[in-house]
Amino acid sequence: MGLSSTTWFVIAVIIVLLGVGLLFVDRKQQGGSAAVKDRRRWAALRGWEFLDTDPVLPSRWRYGTIHQGGPGVAKNLISGEVPLPDGSRQAYVFDHEQAGRVTSVLAAIQSQTQLNAAVELRLPTAPVPDDVALEYLEPVGERYAFVSDADAVRPLLTRRLARAADAVGDDVELLWAEESWVLATAPVESSADRLQELLADLAEVAIALEQGQNAHT
């Protein structure tokens, strides 16, 4: 007994859906591969180091998305120095994999001073931190400051910091500073050019924090 026309129609629909699904996966993989090649090329042009994976680096920090989803693993990591007028700063950019999936691109740049407390600067669209060690302090430009020590951080929240934080852009909902690092999370699809701009913006945030700290020491 042959299959009915309805059955053949259902089979055809399933085949089409499977084909579309495979095409989507293939394009997604190609896009990911292109992004990795782009980052490799970027690292090579600047003499930076590229690593496929680093399971240890993210555990260096504890606030921001590190607290939210755990240290996870650094994928497609590039590391090197960002030249600035007052000296070069160590920097990292990597795909942040948490619980088996990449949740964001994390960029980090080293500061020349050590902060006595942590500060997270979140856009209004970002979720409120669930870290009990942080408390809301005040607005900083377009962002809200959540800090681990209000007395230590308040003098650092200058107009220059507000301008630097606002310049980071609306695609970066969360940036934070802890110890001698300034970090930010960017969307997974961020281009190499955008990440280069982000590192420059984070350098300005780091300088603003340094100046605020030096003015009160």
Specify the residue positions occupied by each region the protein language model found.
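Membrane-cytosol interface segments
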Residues: I15-V16, Q30, P55-T65
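Core hydrophobic alpha-helical transmembrane segments of single-pass membrane proteins
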Residues: A12-V20
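Feature marks short, highly hydrophobic, charge-poor N-terminal signal-anchor/signal peptide-like helices
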Residues: M1-V13
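Charged, low-complexity intrinsically disordered regions
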Residues: R40, A44-R46, D52, P58, ...
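Transmembrane-cytosolic junction motif
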Residues: V20-L45
